[in-house]
Amino acid sequence: NNSKNIKIFGGGKKLSISAACFLHGVRSASIDFDDYEYVAGSHPSAPIFSALISIAQIKKISIEETYQGWLVGYELIIKLGQALSYDHYYKGWHSANTIGVIGTAAAVSKVLKLNADQMANAISIATSFSSGLKQQFGTDIKAFHVGFASQAGVQSALLAKNGGTANQDIWNIERGFIELYGSKFSKKLNNNIKKSDLGNAIIKFPNFIKFWPVCSYSQRVIQGGLILNKKIFIKKNIKSITIEFPEPWFRVSKFHIPKNSTEARFSLSYCLATALINGKFDLNSLNISKNKKSLNMTRKIKLVTYKVPNTFEDYDPKYPDIIKVIMNDGSILIEKISHIKGGNNYPLKDEDIDNKFLMCGGKKNILNKIRNQKYKKKNLKEIIFLI
């Protein structure tokens, strides 16, 4: 159905299902306030929910079915991440698109009740849309990657539903998906799938929910900056700062002195400086024209990377961010940040989630309605229209 009848979060004209999936995906990632997982290095909920909230307006989907769809998509994203290894992301692929599109196809296939053969075709079709390079980070196209993943994931499921076929053995064959997108550290997808493990990905490898609207690699230095803010009373007495962090992260958080808010999200130096100076970090912190002190502070910050082994996993607490501050009087302060707020050790509270909703433009009266009512047996469409 290509009629323009899908309402869009954030306002604007109604769009077709394809255009709605794309725009929802772009908006979900545009301020980097999404979730992420460390196995594939993707942002699982952004493309999956962007697809589901679009489809739910033309097909009845219960909240329970929404959960199931998300879990199936997440499961496949994790399995693919395990098979490809961290090298997929390290080489330069943006897995939110390369793997996210496949997870989205699986999630949509689940809620559309495709049979096993159709779903196998859908996720294979989705590999033809696997694209997106990390070298685009710091520009608008990074958010577009999530839009592409959402849009193409739905297209893949619909093509399969209507008889479209693809090579169901594409994963492990010679010159197949794993070989081309992986490395010498990759392993066959089938080796990672045991029936006893199915459905447990979210338990074994839970997603992280961002506390601040920046790249996930910038989260730990913000924590460190907020701690240092309470310890350093006269910021102008800072002589120099060094940030030591895992070498792979520099391929992402590479902007020392950002030129705009998009680059600022991928700037360890700017995020640290802003948190240290202001004692807080929110969406306004990314308006660099109003944070001149932060920009000036970045010039005092030196970025130093350290090597990690081939077995490195993202956000492993064994490989922390280390912030070293030298004051004008020669005194030294060191903060070592190993865990991320929003992760396993410091999960977000309901009030933190509520604040994210409000920061993104949500209304408090709507939030109260959602919090005070039980929606488990209701349709996703009802909540969409409420918001």
Predicted regions mapped to residue ranges:
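Terminal-appendage/accessory-domain detector
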Residues: 1-41, 138-152, 158-387
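Function-dense linear segments that define catalytic or interfacial modules
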Residues: 22-62, 76
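Glycine-rich, mobile lid/loop segments that gate access to catalytic sites or pores
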Residues: 57-155, 162, 167-174
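Contiguous domain-boundary segments centered on the initiation and propagation of an alpha-helix
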Residues: 42-46, 61-64, 71, 288-292, ...
